[in-house]
Amino acid sequence: YVVNYGTAGSLNKNISGLIEVSKFYQRDMDVRGLGFQLGQTPFENDLFVQLDKNGYSCGTGDSFVMTSPDLVTDIVDMEAYSYAKFCKINKLNFICFKFISDNADDDAGKDWSKAFKKGAKEFSLFFQKEYEGIKI
């Protein structure tokens, strides 16, 4: 298994705490001017990576989100899409958990700093309990 844990900003005020993510978009891929959809990498068929489970959607990009992005997902981060895509291509099991650290707004930077350690502790306790014995 490849496990991704990290913090994320929520674009949905009803999402908080530690969540599992199952759908991944590349939120800052924008070549609509060439006829592709927002989030679509040119000459690739898939607009997103979907795991075989239920969970939230995540838009990954190269920026810390402080305003609503054009490609709207449940949460935003800066790394999960690349892990999900790598694992899909290489047929590796992948699970992804995010701790909601902020609401991807003007206060995101301050909120993230406060939530970072709390999220790591919650994930550690959760993972030890739920995935005892899993080989990573």
Mark where each language-model region is.
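Glycine-rich phosphate- or other oxyanion-binding loops that anchor nucleotides, phosphorylated ligands
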Residues: 1-136
